[in-house]
């Protein structure tokens, strides 16, 4: 089933750049269509800031529980019995937060009067594109087009992600089972966020960083508390080290 649509503004990509532009264009009275192949909200909402903070929050809760489960307890509070991790349940909880916020973005688009079409857009000219959706193709002619497609992670050529043993940051947010050991390539804020969360949950974590320190582009005053935390939690850090490959 195919359809044809015309609009004054077409936005391709419903991340924070795209959906805000679509909402504003619609608020100003322009016929607006926004196209997105994934969920609305972009990296921050779907596979970045928000889901990672959810995992981190769960990890902090678990770490605090383990303090109270220690032999002498913590602050005079003791919890008897085992404290266990259900990684799949944590991921489900994280996904529920993402889905709720995703629906919020879709509601904002609808309230502003912007039409959301879910699918992949292919341009046939500077003013026209064809969107492949689950229901069929939609041809859109637009007076103005905003391209806000964002980006994706880059695989290391010698160590491509298979999302089973070698995983991207996106895959790390969808782990169904906590790994016993994890090597994190890159000691920037994304690698450290995920590495610290997995360490709190009980994994043995090693950080591999090519520069002379973790968070190398940040001030020493910011790095120092992180380095202290890593040492305290027995996270192994190799600086000025380059990963060359992996054996699975």
Language model segments and positions:
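Beta1/beta-strand and adjacent pyrophosphate-binding region of the FAD-binding site
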Residues: 3-15, 178-188
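Glycine-rich flavin
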Residues: 2-7, 23-30, 35-178, 211-215, ...
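N-terminal Rossmann-like FAD-binding beta1-loop-alpha1 element of flavoenzymes
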Residues: 8-34, 191-199
């Amino acid at each position: 089933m195919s359809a044809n649509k015309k609009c004054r503004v077409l936005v391709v990509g419903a991340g924070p750049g795209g959906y805000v532009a679509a909402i504003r264009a619609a608020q100003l009275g322009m016929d607006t269509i926004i196209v997105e192949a994934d969920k609305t909200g972009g990296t921050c909402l779907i596979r970045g800031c928000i889901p990672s903070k959810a995992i981190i929050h769960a990890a902090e809760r678990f770490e605090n529980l383990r303090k109270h489960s220690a032999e002498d307890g913590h602050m005079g509070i003791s919890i008897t019995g085992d404290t266990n991790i259900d990684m799949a349940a944590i991921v489900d909880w994280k996904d529920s937060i993402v889905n709720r916020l995703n629906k919020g973005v879709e509601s904002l688009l609808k309230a502003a009067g912007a039409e959301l079409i879910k699918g992949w857009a292919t341009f046939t000219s500077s003013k026209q594109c064809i969107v492949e959706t689950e229901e069929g193709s939609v041809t859109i002619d637009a007076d103005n087009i905003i391209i806000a497609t964002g980006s994706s992670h880059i695989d290391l050529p010698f160590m491509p992600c298979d999302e089973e043993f070698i995983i991207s940051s996106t895959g790390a947010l969808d782990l169904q089972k906590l790994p016993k050991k994890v090597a994190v390539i890159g000691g920037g804020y994304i690698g450290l966020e995920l590495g610290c969360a997995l360490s709190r949950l009980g994994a043995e974590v090693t950080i591999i960083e090519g520069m002379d320190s973790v968070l190398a582009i940040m001030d020493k005053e910011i790095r120092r508390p992180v380095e202290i935390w890593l040492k305290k939690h027995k996270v192994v850090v190799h600086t000025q080290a380059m990963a060359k490959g992996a054996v699975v």
